[in-house]
Amino acid sequence: MKVQLNIRDYLDRAVAVYGDRVGVIDEPDQPAPSLGSLTYSEIGDHAKALAAGLDALGVGPGERVAVVSQNSARLLIAFFGVSGWGRVLVPINFRLHAEEIRYIVQHSGATVFLIDPELAVDLDDIDCQHKFVIG
């Protein structure tokens, strides 16, 4: 019996088997707006939407997408939406200083930079081909 074990397969299985169950509860007291409770189906929908957005930008498989986010539903969605469709996620610790984050973004080869809303002002001057505030 062949069992797929890639990231996309885990998401697809969770959506198929547990679709209506709660998959994540976002912290209500975080600095960025909370996404509340999301079912596995909703996580899958958000991940597909992110992947479609990256497709529309022309970001192909193997290209890097940097994300700086607290441990949140947004980070989980980025994990599946980026890695599940063949791109490389570059997770960056939100506790780093802006100069450290700039270094990682510039030296990672990321063409897309996803930023949590509460960090956007501090990271506004970091250059990347595509930069988006998530959430």
Predicted feature locations:
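Residue-level marker of alpha-helix boundaries and capping positions
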Residues: 1-2, 41, 69, 92
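Residue-level recognition of oxygen-bearing side chains
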Residues: 6, 49, 74, 109, ...
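A structure-centric signal for secondary-structure junctions around beta-strands
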Residues: 19-21, 62, 128
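Structural core segment of the AMP-binding/adenylate-forming
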Residues: 2, 10-12, 56-57, 84-135
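Conserved AMP-binding/adenylate-forming core of the ANL superfamily
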Residues: 23-72, 76-80, 97-102
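A short N-terminal helical cap/helix-turn-helix that marks the beginning
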Residues: 2-25
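Residue-level signal for pocket-adjacent positions within structured domains
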Residues: 19, 33, 87-91
